[in-house]
Amino acid sequence: MSQFNPMGGQSTTIQSSLVPIVVEQTARGERSYDIYSRLLKERVIFLVGQVEDHMANLVVAQLLFLEAENPDKDIHLYINSPGGSVTAGMSIYDTMQFIKPDVSTMCIGQACSMGSFLLSAGATGKRFCLPNARTMIHQPSGGAQGQASDIHIHAQEILKIRARLNEIMAKHTGKSVEEVARDTERDNFMSAEESKAYGLVDDVLYQRVPEESK
């Protein structure tokens, strides 16, 4: 497997020395992986921390890599994020929709702002939340300074982005655009069950469902 660091989305405060190493026995001897690289072999991707360009590029790279490995097998995206950059998040969103495999999403901890947006963008019927996880939706925010005309241009751009995000959120949740616009006017926090009722996820998982014996 290609060697790149899937920990790119993790907080920089986490020291690499704290990441567990998994050792496997193979026909060629022992092989060691950090735990996240080992989980990538199982088609598990972690989106953890702020959504920003570096983390988004790594998530996109992993999505494309797993599609190339097997275009017919699901990818599992675990999300624990307070949100972040809209453009970085949209690069992940567009890739999720572009690739052939279904992307199953799972909220662990929290999925706020762009995190909740990506959570809702998983394949229909394959969007999940753990029971004590929290989500939050709201409108995009930004700031500008300079000439009045430039500030006006930036304000208009934020409004266009907000309208587009509302359209996409409405598509994935089954809500109307008007409902989404109203519900994202301010920070709107939801429990796991409330997230399910709103349509951000399809189910709340209290324990792993055992696989059927073959």
Curated annotation (Swiss-Prot):
PROSITE patterns for the chain: CLP_PROTEASE_HIS, CLP_PROTEASE_SER
Compartment(s): Cytoplasm
Record flagged with keyword Hydrolase: yes
- Name the enzyme's class: hydrolase
Provide this UniProt record's keywords sorted from A to Z.
Answer: Cytoplasm, Hydrolase, Protease, Serine protease
Known catalytic reactions: Hydrolysis of proteins to small peptides in the presence of ATP and magnesium. alpha-casein is the usual test substrate. In the absence of ATP, only oligopeptides shorter than five residues are hydrolyzed (such as succinyl-Leu-Tyr-|-NHMec, and Leu-Tyr-Leu-|-Tyr-Trp, in which cleavage of the -Tyr-|-Leu- and -Tyr-|-Trp bonds also occurs)
Keyword Iron found: no
Active site (record annotation) = 113, 138
Name a single GO cellular component. Answer: endopeptidase Clp complex
EC numbers listed for it are 3.4.21.92
Tell me which Gene Ontology terms the entry assigns under biological process. Answer: protein quality control for misfolded or incompletely synthesized proteins
Fetch the InterPro entries from UniProt: ClpP, ClpP/crotonase-like_dom_sf, ClpP/TepA, ClpP_His_AS, ClpP_Ser_AS
Does the entry annotate any disulfide bonds, and if so which pairs?
Answer: none
| GO MF annotation terms | ATP-dependent peptidase activity; ATPase binding; serine-type endopeptidase activity
Q: Briefly, what is this protein's role?
A: Cleaves peptides in various proteins in a process that requires ATP hydrolysis. Has a chymotrypsin-like activity. Plays a major role in the degradation of misfolded proteins.
The record's similarity note reads: Belongs to the peptidase S14 family.
What quaternary structure, including any partners, is listed in this protein's UniProt entry? Fourteen ClpP subunits assemble into 2 heptameric rings which stack back to back to give a disk-like structure with a central cavity, resembling the structure of eukaryotic proteasomes.
Q: What is this protein called?
A: ATP-dependent Clp protease proteolytic subunit
Q: Which organism is it from?
A: Teredinibacter turnerae (strain ATCC 39867 / T7901)
Provide the gene name from the record. Answer: clpP
